[in-house]
Structure formats: structure tokens, C-alpha cells
Amino acid sequence: NPFTQYRYNLERYVKETREAGATPILMSSIVRRKFNEHGTLEDTHGNYPLVVRMVARDLEVPFIDMQYLTERLERKFGPEKSESIHLHFEPGENPYYQNGKHDDTHLSYTGAKMIASLALQEIARQDLALENYIKHQVLEAEIVTLKD
């Protein structure tokens, strides 16, 4: 249940992180690639992302809305092109998946780079202290942009 044990665990992680002298940052989950027959991206996470938002607000923790950012990315790519973000391989196309793979949850190497880029861009946009540890050439590379 996102409103009980999940929320409790998030609050505990924030408390323990602060007690250790670190600064917590909460992120919502990335979306799954699930388009319906009309080409509309469907939510698959229920209330879990909402609870992360609530904990971030209530405990005044920096929050990165990866659900929103990745939803925009999936929509920008659309039902077909978004396969490249995930593990979609035909038999023999990838040595790790000789029999092929059609996985709309896990990311391809390309997708992982895109999602990491979005997270890093948001860290910089929010001017979080963590930005000091990001190489500027990584931010300047702008692997993916959500600008229209």
C-alpha cells in the first residue's frame, strides 16, 4: 500500500539520510511504455508517485519528477519510436537477447542515457548542490531534450 509501508519507508530513508549528514533527494518512478490502442500513454504506477510527491512536500525534500519527465519523453517519441528507449530487440539483433526481447519496463542503453540525462538536467535546473559533482561536458552534451 503506497500510503502506509511505502510512505513510512520513504520517510525513514529521508530521516536516516539527514541524520548521516547527507541531503536527500526524492525522485518519482519513470513511466512504463504502455500505450493503449489510441496511442495514449497509460499510467501503471497508481498512487506510488503521488506518495513520493507528498513526502517530498511534507518533509521539504528536493524532488525530481521523473514520472513527468519520462512521460513527456515517451509521448515525444510515440508508440513506435519509444521502443528504442526500452529493451526491444528482434532475435539475433542483440547478443544478450539472442531470442529477442520485448520489455516495456526496462531501459536500453540508449534509453538509460536519455533518462540519466533528464535527471541530470533537472538537478542542474533546480540548482541542487549535487550539480557540483556533475561534469559540465555531460550537461552540455544534452543527450536528450524535451523542448519542442
Q: For each predicted feature, which ranges?
A:
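Acidic helix/loop microenvironments that form the catalytic cleft of cell-wall polysaccharide enzymes
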Residues: 138
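Alpha-helical cap/lid subdomain in secreted, periplasmic
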Residues: 1-113, 117-135, 143-148
